[in-house]
Amino acid sequence: MEAGAYLNAIIFVLVATIIAVISVGLTQTEPCTIRITGESITVHACHLDSETIKALATLKPLSLERLSFHQ
């Protein structure tokens, strides 16, 4: 095999690797996280449609006074 063929093979492998890395990076997404604390409600990386927005609007921060403990 001559030097030009080796160079072409190396370039092909590099381009294929770059394409694979980019495509994997584009398909990975963060999970939807809704964190409710005593002070706030935080929504991170979630797809928000109108139904989800309405549901989130009714949430309130966690409060011990509103919790009931049944014996």
Swiss-Prot record:
GO terms for biological process: transport of virus in host, cell to cell. Residues 1-3 are lumenal. Keywords: Host endoplasmic reticulum, Host membrane, Membrane, Transmembrane, Transmembrane helix, Transport, Viral movement protein. Residues 27-71 are cytoplasmic. The chain crosses the membrane at residues 4-26. The keyword Transmembrane helix applies. The keyword Membrane applies. Pfam families: TGBp3. It is found in: Host endoplasmic reticulum membrane. It comes from the Viruses. InterPro entries: TGBp3 (IPR003411). GO terms for cellular component: host cell endoplasmic reticulum membrane; membrane. Plays a role in viral cell-to-cell propagation, by facilitating genome transport to neighboring plant cells through plasmosdesmata. May induce the formation of granular vesicles derived from the Endoplasmic reticulum, which align on actin filaments. Belongs to the Tymovirales TGBp3 protein family. TGBp1, TGBp2 and TGBp3 seem to act together for cell-to-cell propagation. TGBp1 is the main movement protein that physically cross the plasmodesma with the viral genome. TGBp2 and TGBp3 would facilitate TGBp1 function. This is Movement protein TGBp3. It comes from Potato virus X (strain HB) (PVX).
